[in-house]
UniProtKB/Swiss-Prot annotation:
PANTHER family: DTDP-4-AMINO-4,6-DIDEOXYGALACTOSE TRANSAMINASE, TRANSAMINASE. Belongs to the DegT/DnrJ/EryC1 family. GO terms for biological process: polysaccharide biosynthetic process. This is Uncharacterized protein MJ1066. GO terms for molecular function: pyridoxal phosphate binding; transaminase activity. Its cofactor is pyridoxal 5'-phosphate. Keywords: Pyridoxal phosphate. It comes from Methanocaldococcus jannaschii (strain ATCC 43067 / DSM 2661 / JAL-1 / JCM 10045 / NBRC 100440) (Methanococcus jannaschii). The keyword Amino-acid biosynthesis does not apply. The keyword GTP-binding does not apply. The modification N6-(pyridoxal phosphate)lysine is found at K185. CDD domains: AHBA_syn (cd00616).
Length: 386
Protein backbone atom coordinates (compact mmCIF):
# COMPACT_ATOMS: atom_id res chain seq x y z
CA UNK A 1 0.00 0.00 0.00
CA UNK A 2 1.34 3.43 -1.01
CA UNK A 3 0.07 5.31 2.07
CA UNK A 4 -1.35 4.42 5.47
CA UNK A 5 -4.07 7.09 5.73
CA UNK A 6 -6.79 7.83 3.18
CA UNK A 7 -6.25 10.88 0.96
CA UNK A 8 -9.71 12.27 0.16
CA UNK A 9 -10.55 13.65 -3.29
CA UNK A 10 -10.87 17.14 -1.76
CA UNK A 11 -10.56 19.08 1.47
CA UNK A 12 -11.72 22.67 2.03
CA UNK A 13 -8.98 25.12 2.99
CA UNK A 14 -10.44 27.08 5.91
CA UNK A 15 -8.20 29.27 8.09
CA UNK A 16 -8.51 31.09 11.39
CA UNK A 17 -9.46 34.28 9.53
CA UNK A 18 -12.66 32.70 8.21
CA UNK A 19 -13.48 31.17 11.60
CA UNK A 20 -12.98 34.47 13.43
CA UNK A 21 -15.08 36.36 10.87
CA UNK A 22 -17.94 33.88 11.27
CA UNK A 23 -17.75 34.22 15.06
CA UNK A 24 -17.85 38.01 14.67
CA UNK A 25 -20.95 37.69 12.50
CA UNK A 26 -22.69 35.38 14.96
CA UNK A 27 -21.98 37.81 17.78
CA UNK A 28 -23.28 40.74 15.72
CA UNK A 29 -26.84 39.31 15.68
CA UNK A 30 -26.99 39.93 11.90
CA UNK A 31 -26.66 36.46 10.39
CA UNK A 32 -28.76 36.57 7.22
CA UNK A 33 -28.11 38.73 4.13
CA UNK A 34 -26.66 42.02 5.28
CA UNK A 35 -23.54 44.21 5.40
CA UNK A 36 -20.99 41.40 5.08
CA UNK A 37 -22.80 40.00 2.07
CA UNK A 38 -22.55 43.43 0.45
CA UNK A 39 -18.85 43.63 1.36
CA UNK A 40 -18.21 40.24 -0.21
CA UNK A 41 -20.00 41.35 -3.38
CA UNK A 42 -17.85 44.48 -3.57
CA UNK A 43 -14.62 42.52 -3.07
CA UNK A 44 -15.68 39.97 -5.68
CA UNK A 45 -16.64 42.64 -8.20
CA UNK A 46 -13.22 44.24 -7.79
CA UNK A 47 -11.43 40.89 -8.04
CA UNK A 48 -13.18 39.91 -11.27
CA UNK A 49 -13.28 43.40 -12.77
CA UNK A 50 -17.00 43.33 -13.53
CA UNK A 51 -19.40 46.22 -12.94
CA UNK A 52 -21.79 44.11 -10.86
CA UNK A 53 -21.59 41.03 -8.64
CA UNK A 54 -24.71 39.53 -7.04
CA UNK A 55 -24.32 36.94 -4.29
CA UNK A 56 -26.60 33.90 -4.20
CA UNK A 57 -26.93 30.58 -2.41
CA UNK A 58 -25.48 28.59 -5.32
CA UNK A 59 -24.09 28.72 -8.83
CA UNK A 60 -27.25 26.89 -9.86
CA UNK A 61 -29.30 29.85 -8.65
CA UNK A 62 -27.06 32.15 -10.69
CA UNK A 63 -27.63 30.19 -13.87
CA UNK A 64 -31.37 30.00 -13.20
CA UNK A 65 -31.79 33.71 -12.46
CA UNK A 66 -29.71 34.58 -15.52
CA UNK A 67 -32.20 32.66 -17.66
CA UNK A 68 -35.15 34.32 -15.89
CA UNK A 69 -33.63 37.81 -16.20
CA UNK A 70 -33.00 37.24 -19.92
CA UNK A 71 -36.59 36.04 -20.42
CA UNK A 72 -35.75 32.49 -21.50
CA UNK A 73 -39.10 30.73 -21.43
CA UNK A 74 -41.39 27.96 -22.65
CA UNK A 75 -40.38 26.44 -26.03
CA UNK A 76 -37.10 28.37 -26.22
CA UNK A 77 -33.88 26.43 -26.77
CA UNK A 78 -30.55 26.86 -25.00
CA UNK A 79 -27.34 25.32 -26.32
CA UNK A 80 -24.89 23.80 -23.87
CA UNK A 81 -22.58 20.83 -23.35
CA UNK A 82 -23.68 17.38 -22.18
CA UNK A 83 -20.38 17.04 -20.32
CA UNK A 84 -21.34 18.95 -17.19
CA UNK A 85 -23.12 18.64 -13.86
CA UNK A 86 -26.91 18.33 -13.86
CA UNK A 87 -27.41 21.95 -12.73
CA UNK A 88 -26.46 23.33 -16.14
CA UNK A 89 -29.21 21.40 -17.89
CA UNK A 90 -31.75 21.45 -15.09
CA UNK A 91 -32.02 25.24 -14.94
CA UNK A 92 -32.95 25.28 -18.62
CA UNK A 93 -35.70 22.74 -17.95
CA UNK A 94 -36.95 24.81 -14.99
CA UNK A 95 -37.70 27.58 -17.51
CA UNK A 96 -39.63 25.05 -19.63
CA UNK A 97 -37.01 25.54 -22.33
CA UNK A 98 -35.14 22.75 -24.12
CA UNK A 99 -31.47 21.99 -23.47
CA UNK A 100 -29.81 21.38 -26.83
CA UNK A 101 -26.52 19.58 -26.33
CA UNK A 102 -23.45 20.03 -28.50
CA UNK A 103 -20.61 17.53 -28.24
CA UNK A 104 -17.26 18.44 -26.69
CA UNK A 105 -13.80 19.04 -28.04
CA UNK A 106 -11.64 15.97 -27.34
CA UNK A 107 -8.67 18.07 -26.22
CA UNK A 108 -10.14 20.55 -23.72
CA UNK A 109 -13.40 18.69 -22.93
CA UNK A 110 -15.23 21.98 -23.47
CA UNK A 111 -18.08 22.55 -25.93
CA UNK A 112 -16.92 22.14 -29.54
CA UNK A 113 -17.42 25.62 -31.00
CA UNK A 114 -17.30 24.25 -34.55
CA UNK A 115 -20.56 22.37 -33.95
CA UNK A 116 -22.57 25.14 -32.25
CA UNK A 117 -23.97 26.73 -35.42
CA UNK A 118 -25.39 23.40 -36.58
CA UNK A 119 -27.49 23.26 -33.39
CA UNK A 120 -29.04 26.72 -33.79
CA UNK A 121 -32.71 26.95 -34.74
CA UNK A 122 -35.27 29.75 -34.79
CA UNK A 123 -36.05 28.87 -31.15
CA UNK A 124 -32.46 29.22 -29.90
CA UNK A 125 -32.08 32.06 -27.41
CA UNK A 126 -28.81 31.47 -25.54
CA UNK A 127 -25.57 29.52 -25.23
CA UNK A 128 -24.26 28.26 -21.88
CA UNK A 129 -20.54 27.48 -22.24
CA UNK A 130 -19.14 25.49 -19.30
CA UNK A 131 -15.48 26.07 -18.47
CA UNK A 132 -14.77 22.44 -17.66
CA UNK A 133 -12.21 21.78 -14.89
CA UNK A 134 -11.25 25.47 -15.02
CA UNK A 135 -10.06 25.60 -18.65
CA UNK A 136 -11.85 28.48 -20.42
CA UNK A 137 -13.94 27.80 -23.50
CA UNK A 138 -13.12 29.46 -26.82
CA UNK A 139 -15.02 32.61 -25.99
CA UNK A 140 -14.12 34.69 -29.08
CA UNK A 141 -15.76 32.12 -31.35
CA UNK A 142 -18.75 31.73 -29.03
CA UNK A 143 -19.29 35.50 -28.83
CA UNK A 144 -19.10 35.83 -32.61
CA UNK A 145 -21.74 33.14 -33.06
CA UNK A 146 -23.90 34.82 -30.40
CA UNK A 147 -23.62 38.19 -32.17
CA UNK A 148 -24.39 36.69 -35.58
CA UNK A 149 -27.54 34.97 -34.30
CA UNK A 150 -28.58 37.48 -31.61
CA UNK A 151 -28.08 35.05 -28.72
CA UNK A 152 -27.22 35.56 -25.06
CA UNK A 153 -24.07 34.04 -23.56
CA UNK A 154 -24.50 32.75 -20.00
CA UNK A 155 -21.20 31.38 -18.71
CA UNK A 156 -21.09 28.48 -16.27
CA UNK A 157 -17.88 29.21 -14.36
CA UNK A 158 -18.50 26.85 -11.45
CA UNK A 159 -14.97 25.49 -12.05
CA UNK A 160 -13.32 28.65 -13.31
CA UNK A 161 -12.70 31.20 -10.55
CA UNK A 162 -9.39 32.88 -11.34
CA UNK A 163 -9.24 31.58 -14.92
CA UNK A 164 -8.46 33.91 -17.80
CA UNK A 165 -9.09 33.86 -21.54
CA UNK A 166 -6.65 35.89 -23.64
CA UNK A 167 -5.87 38.08 -20.64
CA UNK A 168 -9.53 38.64 -19.69
CA UNK A 169 -10.79 37.23 -16.41
CA UNK A 170 -13.63 34.77 -16.70
CA UNK A 171 -16.58 36.75 -15.37
CA UNK A 172 -16.08 39.75 -17.68
CA UNK A 173 -16.88 38.25 -21.09
CA UNK A 174 -20.44 36.91 -21.44
CA UNK A 175 -23.79 38.56 -20.64
CA UNK A 176 -23.66 36.88 -17.22
CA UNK A 177 -21.24 34.50 -15.49
CA UNK A 178 -22.10 32.22 -12.57
CA UNK A 179 -19.52 31.05 -10.02
CA UNK A 180 -19.78 28.32 -7.38
CA UNK A 181 -18.59 28.40 -3.77
CA UNK A 182 -19.59 24.81 -2.98
CA UNK A 183 -17.38 22.93 -0.50
CA UNK A 184 -15.15 21.44 -3.21
CA UNK A 185 -14.63 24.60 -5.24
CA UNK A 186 -11.57 26.85 -5.56
CA UNK A 187 -13.00 29.08 -2.85
CA UNK A 188 -15.87 28.01 -0.64
CA UNK A 189 -18.63 29.44 1.51
CA UNK A 190 -19.99 25.95 2.24
CA UNK A 191 -22.83 26.58 -0.17
CA UNK A 192 -22.97 29.72 -2.27
CA UNK A 193 -22.58 31.40 -5.62
CA UNK A 194 -22.11 34.70 -7.41
CA UNK A 195 -23.28 36.18 -10.71
CA UNK A 196 -21.22 38.82 -12.48
CA UNK A 197 -22.39 41.07 -15.29
CA UNK A 198 -21.71 44.48 -16.80
CA UNK A 199 -25.39 45.01 -17.59
CA UNK A 200 -27.13 47.12 -14.93
CA UNK A 201 -30.64 46.06 -15.96
CA UNK A 202 -29.77 42.36 -15.65
CA UNK A 203 -28.03 42.97 -12.32
CA UNK A 204 -31.01 44.81 -10.83
CA UNK A 205 -33.42 42.12 -12.00
CA UNK A 206 -31.32 39.35 -10.42
CA UNK A 207 -31.03 41.30 -7.16
CA UNK A 208 -34.81 41.52 -6.94
CA UNK A 209 -35.44 37.94 -8.04
CA UNK A 210 -33.03 36.44 -5.49
CA UNK A 211 -35.20 37.52 -2.53
CA UNK A 212 -38.85 36.75 -3.37
CA UNK A 213 -39.15 39.69 -5.78
CA UNK A 214 -39.16 42.14 -2.88
CA UNK A 215 -38.32 45.74 -3.75
CA UNK A 216 -34.61 46.53 -3.56
CA UNK A 217 -32.84 46.71 -0.17
CA UNK A 218 -35.88 45.32 1.64
CA UNK A 219 -33.46 43.25 3.76
CA UNK A 220 -32.78 46.50 5.64
CA UNK A 221 -36.33 46.43 7.06
CA UNK A 222 -34.97 44.71 10.17
CA UNK A 223 -32.27 47.36 10.72
CA UNK A 224 -32.38 50.91 12.07
CA UNK A 225 -32.14 52.19 8.48
CA UNK A 226 -35.13 50.27 7.16
CA UNK A 227 -38.91 50.35 7.08
CA UNK A 228 -41.44 47.58 7.66
CA UNK A 229 -43.08 48.38 4.32
CA UNK A 230 -42.09 46.47 1.18
CA UNK A 231 -43.60 45.57 -2.17
CA UNK A 232 -43.42 42.41 -4.27
CA UNK A 233 -42.54 43.62 -7.75
CA UNK A 234 -41.52 40.25 -9.27
CA UNK A 235 -42.41 36.61 -8.62
CA UNK A 236 -39.01 35.84 -7.13
CA UNK A 237 -37.15 33.07 -5.36
CA UNK A 238 -35.32 32.40 -2.07
CA UNK A 239 -31.80 32.42 -3.48
CA UNK A 240 -29.95 34.93 -1.31
CA UNK A 241 -26.63 34.43 0.46
CA UNK A 242 -26.24 35.00 4.23
CA UNK A 243 -23.67 37.01 6.16
CA UNK A 244 -22.40 33.77 7.71
CA UNK A 245 -21.51 32.45 4.25
CA UNK A 246 -20.15 35.83 3.16
CA UNK A 247 -17.90 35.93 6.24
CA UNK A 248 -16.14 32.83 4.94
CA UNK A 249 -16.07 34.14 1.37
CA UNK A 250 -14.45 37.46 2.29
CA UNK A 251 -11.30 35.72 3.49
CA UNK A 252 -11.39 32.89 0.95
CA UNK A 253 -11.34 35.47 -1.83
CA UNK A 254 -8.26 37.18 -0.37
CA UNK A 255 -6.25 33.99 -0.90
CA UNK A 256 -7.95 32.82 -4.10
CA UNK A 257 -4.89 33.35 -6.29
CA UNK A 258 -2.53 31.76 -3.76
CA UNK A 259 -4.77 28.69 -3.67
CA UNK A 260 -5.08 28.63 -7.47
CA UNK A 261 -1.29 28.72 -7.80
CA UNK A 262 -0.95 25.76 -5.44
CA UNK A 263 -3.42 23.85 -7.60
CA UNK A 264 -1.33 24.83 -10.62
CA UNK A 265 1.85 23.54 -8.92
CA UNK A 266 0.19 20.19 -8.28
CA UNK A 267 -1.10 20.01 -11.86
CA UNK A 268 2.42 20.73 -13.15
CA UNK A 269 3.83 17.82 -11.14
CA UNK A 270 1.10 15.51 -12.42
CA UNK A 271 1.71 16.63 -16.00
CA UNK A 272 5.46 16.10 -15.76
CA UNK A 273 5.07 12.66 -14.20
CA UNK A 274 2.27 11.38 -16.44
CA UNK A 275 2.53 13.03 -19.87
CA UNK A 276 5.05 10.54 -21.28
CA UNK A 277 3.63 7.51 -19.50
CA UNK A 278 2.03 5.09 -21.94
CA UNK A 279 -1.52 4.36 -20.90
CA UNK A 280 -2.35 7.85 -19.63
CA UNK A 281 -3.64 11.02 -21.31
CA UNK A 282 -2.95 14.30 -19.49
CA UNK A 283 -5.06 17.48 -19.85
CA UNK A 284 -4.38 19.84 -22.75
CA UNK A 285 -3.86 23.50 -21.81
CA UNK A 286 -4.18 26.08 -24.58
CA UNK A 287 -1.48 28.78 -24.60
CA UNK A 288 -3.96 31.67 -24.53
CA UNK A 289 -5.67 30.66 -21.27
CA UNK A 290 -4.93 30.73 -17.56
CA UNK A 291 -6.31 27.52 -16.04
CA UNK A 292 -8.13 27.57 -12.68
CA UNK A 293 -7.33 23.88 -12.05
CA UNK A 294 -10.50 23.10 -10.14
CA UNK A 295 -10.08 19.55 -11.42
CA UNK A 296 -7.22 17.46 -12.71
CA UNK A 297 -8.94 15.16 -15.24
CA UNK A 298 -6.59 12.29 -16.06
CA UNK A 299 -7.70 9.94 -18.82
CA UNK A 300 -6.95 6.23 -18.70
CA UNK A 301 -6.03 4.92 -22.15
CA UNK A 302 -8.10 1.76 -21.96
CA UNK A 303 -6.82 0.66 -25.37
CA UNK A 304 -3.27 0.44 -24.00
CA UNK A 305 -3.96 -0.97 -20.53
CA UNK A 306 -5.49 -4.21 -19.27
CA UNK A 307 -7.75 -2.27 -16.90
CA UNK A 308 -10.75 0.00 -17.33
CA UNK A 309 -11.47 3.30 -15.59
CA UNK A 310 -13.72 1.81 -12.90
CA UNK A 311 -11.15 -0.83 -11.94
CA UNK A 312 -8.42 1.82 -11.95
CA UNK A 313 -10.40 3.84 -9.38
CA UNK A 314 -10.84 0.72 -7.24
CA UNK A 315 -7.09 0.06 -7.35
CA UNK A 316 -6.35 3.66 -6.34
CA UNK A 317 -8.71 3.29 -3.40
CA UNK A 318 -6.78 0.18 -2.32
CA UNK A 319 -3.72 2.45 -2.19
CA UNK A 320 -5.71 4.92 -0.01
CA UNK A 321 -6.08 7.47 -2.81
CA UNK A 322 -9.56 8.98 -3.19
CA UNK A 323 -10.78 10.11 -6.61
CA UNK A 324 -13.95 11.14 -8.41
CA UNK A 325 -15.38 11.22 -11.94
CA UNK A 326 -16.52 14.38 -13.74
CA UNK A 327 -19.02 13.79 -15.30
CA UNK A 328 -21.62 11.26 -16.37
CA UNK A 329 -22.82 13.04 -19.55
CA UNK A 330 -26.31 14.48 -19.10
CA UNK A 331 -27.76 12.73 -22.14
CA UNK A 332 -27.07 9.35 -20.50
CA UNK A 333 -29.17 10.11 -17.41
CA UNK A 334 -32.71 8.66 -17.29
CA UNK A 335 -34.46 12.04 -17.03
CA UNK A 336 -32.84 13.47 -20.17
CA UNK A 337 -33.27 10.25 -22.11
CA UNK A 338 -36.95 10.00 -21.21
CA UNK A 339 -37.82 13.70 -21.53
CA UNK A 340 -35.84 14.71 -24.61
CA UNK A 341 -35.15 11.41 -26.36
CA UNK A 342 -31.39 11.54 -26.02
CA UNK A 343 -29.57 8.20 -26.23
CA UNK A 344 -26.17 6.62 -25.96
CA UNK A 345 -24.11 7.43 -29.04
CA UNK A 346 -25.54 10.94 -29.54
CA UNK A 347 -22.38 12.66 -28.28
CA UNK A 348 -19.46 10.30 -28.86
CA UNK A 349 -16.69 12.61 -27.65
CA UNK A 350 -18.39 13.21 -24.30
CA UNK A 351 -18.92 9.47 -23.90
CA UNK A 352 -15.31 8.71 -24.91
CA UNK A 353 -13.91 11.08 -22.28
CA UNK A 354 -16.37 9.93 -19.61
CA UNK A 355 -15.37 6.28 -20.05
CA UNK A 356 -11.71 7.19 -19.38
CA UNK A 357 -11.76 10.13 -16.93
CA UNK A 358 -10.53 10.09 -13.33
CA UNK A 359 -10.38 13.30 -11.28
CA UNK A 360 -7.24 13.08 -9.17
CA UNK A 361 -6.94 14.95 -5.85
CA UNK A 362 -5.88 18.57 -6.41
CA UNK A 363 -6.34 21.09 -3.61
CA UNK A 364 -4.20 23.53 -1.58
CA UNK A 365 -4.11 21.42 1.59
CA UNK A 366 -2.23 18.65 -0.20
CA UNK A 367 1.40 18.36 0.83
CA UNK A 368 4.18 17.51 -1.61
CA UNK A 369 4.24 14.05 -0.04
CA UNK A 370 0.52 13.68 -0.76
CA UNK A 371 1.11 14.58 -4.41
CA UNK A 372 3.98 12.09 -4.74
CA UNK A 373 1.79 9.41 -3.16
CA UNK A 374 -0.81 9.99 -5.89
CA UNK A 375 1.89 9.87 -8.57
CA UNK A 376 3.38 6.65 -7.22
CA UNK A 377 -0.02 4.99 -6.87
CA UNK A 378 -0.98 5.83 -10.46
CA UNK A 379 2.38 4.64 -11.81
CA UNK A 380 2.13 1.41 -9.82
CA UNK A 381 -1.27 0.57 -11.29
CA UNK A 382 -0.15 1.45 -14.82
CA UNK A 383 2.97 -0.73 -14.54
CA UNK A 384 0.92 -3.68 -13.27
CA UNK A 385 -1.62 -3.43 -16.09
CA UNK A 386 0.37 -2.92 -19.25
Amino acid sequence: MIRESFLPPFRPCIGEEEINEVIDTLKSDWITMGPKTLKFEELFRNYIGSKFAISLNSCTAGLHLSLVALNIKDKDEVITTPYTFAATGNVIVHQRAKPVFVDIDKETYNINVEEIENAITERTKAIIPVHYAGHPCEMDEILKIARDYDLYVIEDAAHALGAEYKGKKIGTIGDTTSFSFYATKNITTGEGGMVTTDNEEIAEKIKILRLHGISRDAWKRYSSEGSWYYEIIECGYKYNMTDIQASIGIHQLKKAEIMRKRREEIAKIYNEEFENLEGLITPTIKKHVKHAWHLYPLLINIDRLKINRTKFIEELKKQNIGTSVHFIPLHLHPFYRKTFGYKKGDFPNAEWVYEREISLPIYPKMTDDDVIDVVNAVKKIVSENR
